[in-house]
């Protein structure tokens, strides 16, 4: 074995040791970060130790303390002869503080090992993230379908004060079957939002989204839908079922149904037909001229109205225009609360038109449809539009389904009194499937909120 090899090994060990030491010291000093409410308790602990020493001194009539002080005095005198007091003093103080901090962190670490076994993150990092997220803005997001859950995955990294208000008009697929067989409100969109906001382990979220592929009566159902249906029966209604499920998944924020009424959508088409049922409307293949619900003006969930009134920021969309977004706004109390809000409000327009709902629609057409459904009230101040067109591969794929990019007609949008926010927020996979990128979308929305909020 050569001397050079040994030297390299020793250098590698030294670098690794320095790296570990630096990381540990960095983790210790994180406990002194502002906003954690740690430093005050640390100072109280130090005060308690000093007070206990003083009490002990009084109890033993101070005699041993004098001996100890004389010993310390002699030691300090010897140190002062070697190092000046302006150097030795701060060094001793720093050493004492490091020992105290090290002892505190090791104590907390021992407790954490029991409470959070196998956790990959350091407790201090969890605390810092928790403080940052729970100091984030109160954001209300309104919509449904995959568009809403995509946005929530991005927003939850900026704030834990998120309220997702979700449509309950779905009557297709697993949700529709459960609605028909058990008389429960459709849980599908709520399940997707809970999974998107979940802060629990990935395996638990995957379990919630698991869809059965076989089994008499189980095929097509997702575990989360069945879980929410069972919880609704146990707790008495969907609102309490969602609250209980949120605890299981450690959800950041809350998910609320727009209403607890059994809502059924209807649409009038340009050819005079009237189509009933959320899943039947896109299949009808006509131009939608009017949309409503049975019963008309269903009562809003009080918690949803409260969240809107307290919101710092309101986001509408993305999602299917007529079957995910507008059904929430047909609950007149929700539309009223949004209209009266002084918070910054923005609409996230879809990237592509949707067959059976918005063929040929421009950005302005989307805005007009929302305004018409809400009695021509202006529920948002700006519209977020994707800047670039998808790839040729995606355009060909979507054209086969009669779906095309939503055209931005700037002048028409400006005439409707809306500001335009242009940004690259698209995600495109290898097969040409496009959707909003959760992280990019959330970043752009929070940046616009910062400008709108400070501009007030």
Swiss-Prot record:
Function, in words: Required for morphogenesis under gluconeogenic growth conditions.
Highest rank taxon of the organism: Bacteria
Broad class of the protein's primary localization: cytoplasm
Family per record: Belongs to the gluconeogenesis factor family.
MF-aspect GO terms: LPPG:FO 2-phospho-L-lactate transferase activity
Location in the cell: Cytoplasm
Organism: Nostoc sp. (strain PCC 7120 / SAG 25.82 / UTEX 2576)
The keyword Cytoplasm appears for this protein: yes
Keyword Cytoplasm part of the UniProt annotation: yes
GO cellular component, one term: cytoplasm
UniProt keyword annotations, A-Z: Cytoplasm
Listed GO biological process terms: regulation of cell shape
Pfam families assigned: CofD (PF01933)
Descriptive protein name: Putative gluconeogenesis factor
């Amino acid at each position: 074995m050569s001397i050079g090899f040994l030297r390299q090994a020793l250098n590698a060990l030294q670098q690794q040791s320095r790296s570990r030491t630096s990381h540990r010291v960095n983790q210790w000093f994180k406990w002194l970060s502002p906003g954690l409410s740690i430093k005050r308790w640390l100072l109280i602990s130090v005060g308690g130790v000093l007070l206990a020493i003083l009490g002990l001194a009084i109890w033993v009539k101070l005699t041993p303390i004098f001996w100890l002080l004389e010993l310390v005095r002699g030691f300090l005198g010897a140190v002062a002869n070697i190092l000046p007091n302006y150097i030795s003093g701060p060094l001793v103080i720093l050493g004492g503080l490091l020992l105290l901090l090290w002892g505190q962190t090791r104590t907390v670490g021992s407790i954490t090992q029991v409470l959070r076994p196998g956790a990959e993150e350091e407790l201090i990092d969890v605390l810092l993230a928790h403080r940052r997220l729970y100091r984030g803005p109160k954001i209300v997001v309104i919509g449904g379908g995959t568009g809403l859950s995509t946005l929530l995955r991005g927003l939850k990294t900026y704030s834990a004060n998120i309220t997702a208000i979700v449509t309950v008009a779905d009557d297709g697929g697993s949700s529709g079957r459960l609605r028909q067989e058990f008389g429960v409100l459709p849980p599908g969109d709520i399940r997707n939002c809970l999974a998107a906001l979940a802060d629990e382990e990935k395996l638990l979220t995957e379990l919630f989204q698991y869809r059965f592929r076989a089994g008499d009566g189980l095929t097509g159902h997702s575990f989360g839908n069945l879980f929410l249906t069972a919880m609704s029966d146990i707790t008495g209604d969907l609102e309490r079922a969602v609250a209980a499920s949120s605890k299981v998944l450690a959800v950041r924020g809350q998910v609320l149904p727009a209403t607890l009424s059994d809502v059924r959508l209807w649409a009038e088409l340009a050819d005079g037909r009237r189509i009933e049922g959320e899943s039947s409307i896109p299949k009808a293949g006509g131009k939608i001229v009017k949309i409503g619900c049975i019963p008309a003006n269903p009562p809003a969930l009080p918690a949803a109205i409260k969240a809107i009134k307290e919101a710092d920021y309101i986001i509408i969309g993305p999602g299917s225009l007529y079957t995910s977004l507008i059904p929430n706004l047909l609950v007149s109390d929700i539309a009223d609360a949004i209209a009266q809000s002084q918070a910054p409000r923005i609409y996230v327009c879809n990237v592509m038109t949707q067959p059976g709902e918005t063929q040929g629609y421009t950005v302005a057409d989307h805005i007009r449809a929302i305004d018409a459904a809400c009695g021509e009230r202006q529920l948002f101040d700006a519209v977020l539009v994707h800047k670039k067109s998808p790839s040729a591969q995606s355009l060909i794929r979507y054209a086969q389904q009669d779906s095309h990019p939503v055209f931005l007609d700037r002048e028409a949008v400006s005439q409707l009194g809306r500001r335009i926010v242009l940004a690259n927020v698209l995600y495109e996979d290898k097969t040409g499937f496009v959707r909003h990128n959760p992280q990019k979308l959330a970043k752009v929305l929070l940046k616009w909120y910062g400008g709108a909020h400070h501009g007030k």
